[in-house]
C-alpha cells in the first residue's frame, strides 16, 4: 500500500521580547511547521509486514527557516496467539538539521552588539525508537476492544511507557459504520489523551471515510486538539 500525508501547524502570532522589553517590543513573529510525507508498506507474509515513510520537513520562526528530509521505518508481526501482535519502529531518523536565515543579535553584554547572525549550530532530529504490543480481549462482528502497551525511547528525553485502549462499535450489519472511542496515558510524563471517531464505508466501493478527533494534555503546552479527515482503501 502507498500513503501520502500533509501536516501543518498554525501557532498564530507570537510576541517578540528582549532583555529590556520582556513584555513585548510591539512586533510579532509567526511559527508554522509543515511536513509532506510519502509512505510505502508491504505485507510479506500473513504474519509479517514492514513499511517506510519519507518526509520533507519545513519550519519557520520569524526570519529563521529549517528544511530537512527524515524517514520512519517499522515492522509488524502477528504472533499467532489470538489477535496479539507487536511492532518495532523508528521515527524521524535522518542527518543533522541546520537553521538558515538572518536575525539581529540584540541585548546587553559584549556578545550582543546588534550584529546580524546568519550561522547557526546543527542539531540532531528528535529520533524516537518504539516497541509496542497490542491485543483484543473482546472482538466479534459488531464490536472490538483493543489494549496496547508501548515502550518509547527518544534521543532527547527520558524513556517512558504508553498505555492505550480503543473500543469500536458497528452500528448494524446493514449500515456497517463504526463509532470509536479512545484513551491513553504516558507513564513517566503524566500525560493523558482521549478521542473519538466515526468510520463510514462507501457502499459499492472499497473506501472508508474517516473522521477523528483527539485531545492531548501536554503539561508544558496545555491542551491540544486534533481533527483528522481521511480516506482508507
Model-derived regions, located:
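Subset of outer-membrane beta-barrel
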Residues: 1-233
